[in-house]
Amino acid sequence: MKRLVIIDNEDSFIYNIAHKIKEVNSFISIEIIKQEEATSSQIEQFDYIILSPGPGLPNESIGMMNLISEFYTKKKILGVCLGHQAINVFFGGRLKKMPKICHGQKTQIFTSSETYFATLYNSWCIDEDYLPDCLEVTARDNSDNIMAIRHKSLPIFGVQFHPESIASDCHKIIFEPFISL
């Protein structure tokens, strides 16, 4: 059985993430571990890591950044909102304040092959001028802000939006391919 851990960065939506993943694959085992309590030996047991949303900025979540450092070549990783930003920062990228703060705002997300709606709860996004060479953009919003990334050679992905939100219609588009790896 595949095992997935959600690293809880003090976000109230982590149980929504677990629920939406179970909708996509009811056979996957899911555990939630608080970021500050996660140990290497615990995380080593899992096939997949989801870095949850949360308050603050990536460099304020030292535990999460350490987990990325330790497991980025060993595990499949998906970052949501803060987790997405952390992946970017870990690989040398920078963030910028969004021109307009978005909290609970439904927006269109555009990929090369489809369009869907997702919900934003953030005031920061990836600064494209400092996007690391190892990452590529896979989705944008109406304002051309980066909304999704993937690593060019490792199974690492990030989404700025919240696919687990009730107002988002994209949880299957995001979670199904990730847990199929």
Q: Where would I find each of the regions flagged by the language model?
A:
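Extreme N-terminal starter segment of soluble prokaryotic enzymes
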Residues: M1-V5
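A generic "structured core" feature
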Residues: N9-S12, H19, E23, I32, ...
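A short beta-strand-loop structural module common to alpha/beta enzyme folds
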Residues: I28-E37
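Short amphipathic alpha-helix with an adjacent loop that forms part of the alpha/beta core around
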Residues: E37-F46
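Cysteine-nucleophile active-site neighborhood
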Residues: F46-T115
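Histidine-centered divalent metal-coordination motifs
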Residues: C81, N122, H162
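Catalytic beta-strand/loop cores that center a nucleophilic Ser/Cys/Thr
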Residues: S113-L154
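Acyltransferase
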Residues: I166-L181
